[in-house]
Amino acid sequence: MALTKAEMSENLFEKLGISKRDAKDLVELFFEEVRRSLENGEQVKLSGFGNFDLRDKNQRPGRNPKTGEDIPITARRVVTFRPGQKLKSRVEKATPKE
């Protein structure tokens, strides 16, 4: 099961006692700030959680899996996430749910 933005908003509503509308706006604002920073070429560092980094990938040769034809994969910028040590540690200690 995946955590959704709606569930995050509901959790903020229940734990902080703010209105559902404010909780939804807070979640949206958080993600918009992350998006805006990445669009501007900035790294996003969330202490105790991890870092969102930008990586420029060079053009490289590829192959169409259906036809076997060689095709170039164009250069592009990708977002990567590196979890912080605290997050890694907590995930390692967590018991898997079935």
From Swiss-Prot:
Q: Which UniProt keywords apply?
A: DNA recombination, DNA-binding, Transcription, Transcription regulation, Translation regulation
The answer to whether UniProt assigns keyword DNA-binding to this entry is yes
GO terms under biological process: DNA recombination; positive regulation of metabolic process; regulation of DNA-templated transcription; regulation of translation
Please give the superkingdom of this protein's source: Bacteria
Gene Ontology molecular function terms on file: DNA binding; structural constituent of chromatin
Q: Where is this region: Disordered?
A: 52-71
Q: Which GO terms describe its cellular component?
A: cytosol
Assembly and partners? Answer: Heterodimer of an alpha and a beta chain.
Query: What does this protein's UniProt record list under function?
Result: This protein is one of the two subunits of integration host factor, a specific DNA-binding protein that functions in genetic recombination as well as in transcriptional and translational control.
Q: Give the UniProt family note.
A: Belongs to the bacterial histone-like protein family.
Name used for this protein in its record: Integration host factor subunit alpha
Organism of derivation: Photorhabdus laumondii subsp. laumondii (strain DSM 15139 / CIP 105565 / TT01) (Photorhabdus luminescens subsp. laumondii)
Q: What is the lineage of its organism?
A: Bacteria, Pseudomonadati, Pseudomonadota, Gammaproteobacteria, Enterobacterales
What's the gene? ihfA
